Amino acid sequence: MISTGLVGLDKLLGGGIAAGIVTDIFGPSGIGKTQLAMQICVNAINEKIIYQDTSGSFRPERILEMLQAKKLGPELLDNIIISRVRNISEQIDNLKKISEMRPGLVVIDTVTDLFSFEYSKESNALEKHIKFMQYMHSLCLLCIQNKIPVVVTNVVRGDEEGYHENLEKSISIFTHKKIRLSKEGNKFLAQVLPCFGAKKEIAYKITPQGLDEIT
């Protein structure tokens, strides 16, 4: 298990980020999705990590701040293999790298962006969902067969029915656990889905050192 760095969230996840599981972190912009993904990387930093960045949001200086907060050396940043992915073909091709390397952690930030960009027309909606589901199926198989913990981040989109995770129906088939990040007033909240029974969530704040739980 890899810790998220948030004790309460780890408990809701059953111990943390598990091997052979695809964990989906989703929420609106500025909510801390990338920060949480980086924090998970820092907690797995002794392993080889593949970090695929589809939006140009990866900032090595943020990882360094988190390492320094844990009194860890900057040389550990070398354990993170960063891929700047610019189109769907590159994103799909990067599956081969995962298969060959079998890293201790894979992070894909953000998993749906390029599919939404390249298939932006309404007439391409079906093709977009099919292509994305094929990709997620391959990623999920790699994750399960090689017992690799995989973390993906995703955005939300608004329509007349409210806000929903981007490509929600297509991604939900292939993700085993979801972490929904949201904000109520001045409070950031993290909830693990599926949630059976009473709603369970933790509150957190965003700091230079990462996400901190508010107890």
Mark where each language-model region is.
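A conditional alpha-helix N-cap/helix-loop micro-motif detector
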Residues: 2-6, 31-34, 88, 129-132
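Pre-Walker A adenine-sensing motif
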Residues: 4-17
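Acidic active-site catalytic centers that drive phospho-/nucleotidyl reactions
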Residues: 10, 53, 109
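Conserved P-loop
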Residues: 18-97
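Short, glycine/charged-enriched secondary-structure capping and boundary segments
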Residues: 39-40, 64-67, 96, 120-123, ...
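Conserved residues at the C-terminal ends of beta-strands
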Residues: 83, 109, 181
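P-loop NTPase motor core
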Residues: 88, 94-173
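Phosphate-binding/switch region of NTP-binding enzymes
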Residues: 141-215
